[in-house]
Amino acid sequence: MKIRRFFILGLLLVSCGEAQEDFDLLKGALQPNAPRFHPRANTLATLRPIPPRLEVGFPSRDLAGVMLLETERDGVQSWLTADGAAITLDHGMLTSAKGFGSGMSSSDVRQSAALILEGQEGQAKRFHSFLNGNDEIELHAYVCQIANLGAETVLLSGNPVATTKLQENCFGIEDTFTNTYWVQNSAQRVVQSLQWTGNFLGNMFIKLVPDDT
């Protein structure tokens, strides 16, 4: 039976009990021994105004929810779940995913980003670091082919946003994967994407949630 539960940190601001239950169900699937709430997540939940949010999910496991922005500097953002799992985005490109099983420790995606943010096709190399079961870092290299799939409208909080859809097919010695990006035409930013985190959970769905203001 598939699990369809939400780890919605934003709901913690409104209904703590409900959010706790949902957080626990997701955490049980991914991190059975994790604490009920991570102290950093509790701190974020008390901030006003509410920090920026992402809709996220793992289609392969039918899991979905929301992450809150913890830090941002020079286009590099750190996002956090209730139980302390975190991702890093560099101008919308996923560079790390920690706390989700065997996810990426870090990555170099500069060549891919240079093409994708400009809506251009071409070939790029990227490098991912993974922590294996022996607590050793493994470096994986990939050659990626980026294709422009044309114009597509994305709804952000019900509002249509004109984007260019791009697909990135990456090939390495040990694994292959496909990332998909929707880049806002007017701002050259990734507003929605499916990006690979590793073999355990596969692709992560990531979507911006516009500010309420």
Regions found by a protein language model. Give the residues of each.
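Poly-acidic low-complexity segments
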Residues: M1-K2, N42
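Sec-dependent signal peptide recognition
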Residues: K2-L9
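N-terminal trafficking/processing presequences and adjacent post-cleavage segments
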Residues: G103-N132
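C-terminal motif of bacterial Sec signal peptides marking the signal peptidase cleavage site
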Residues: L12-S15
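Acidic, serine/threonine-rich low-complexity disordered tracts
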Residues: G17-T88, G92-K98, E121-T213
